Amino acid sequence: MSRIKKLDLDDWDKDLREMTAADSGTPLEQGAMRMFAHTPEISKGLTAFAGSLKQNRSLPDRLVELVRLRVAFHNQCRSCMAIRYKDGQEDGITEDLVCSLEKPMEADNLSDAEKAAIQYGELFATNHLAINDGIYDNLRKYFSESEIVELSMTVAFFVGFGRLAASYHMVEELP
C-alpha cells in the first residue's frame, strides 16, 4: 500500500488535472502525481518543468527512455520500471531492447551514444562522485554541450523523483 494517500481525481486542483491530462491517464500513468496533488501549486511548477524537459527535448526519445529505465532499475522504483511511455515505444523501445539494459555495455543493439548516456545515468544514480572528466569527454564524442546539459537535467529529474516515487511504495497498480 502507498505510504502517502493517493488523491482521487475529483480532489485534484482543476488546473493541475488539465496540465497533466490526468483524466486520460491510467492510474499507473498518473503515478506519483496522485500524491503530489496534495500540493497543487508546487505540483504545477513540477509539471511545467517536466513538460519543458519533454517539449524542448533535442535528445532522441529512445535514448531518454533507455536512460530512464536504467535509472529506474538503480532507484528500484517498481512503478518507474513498469511503465512504458508511448514516445519511447514509437521511437523503437521494445521489450527485447529493455532486456538489453540488464548489461547495457555488452548489448549489441545499443549505439555507442546510448551506452555513453546510460553510463552517465548509472553513475549519477549510483556514484555521482565517480563522474569525472573522462565521463564528460566520452559524452562529448556523441553530444553537444547543450545536449549534455539536457541529459544531465533529465537524469537528475529521473534520479530524484524516481527515488521519491520508490519511497512512496506505489505498487497497487503494478502488473
Where are these regions (language model features)?
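Hydrophobic alpha-helical segments
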Residues: M1-P175
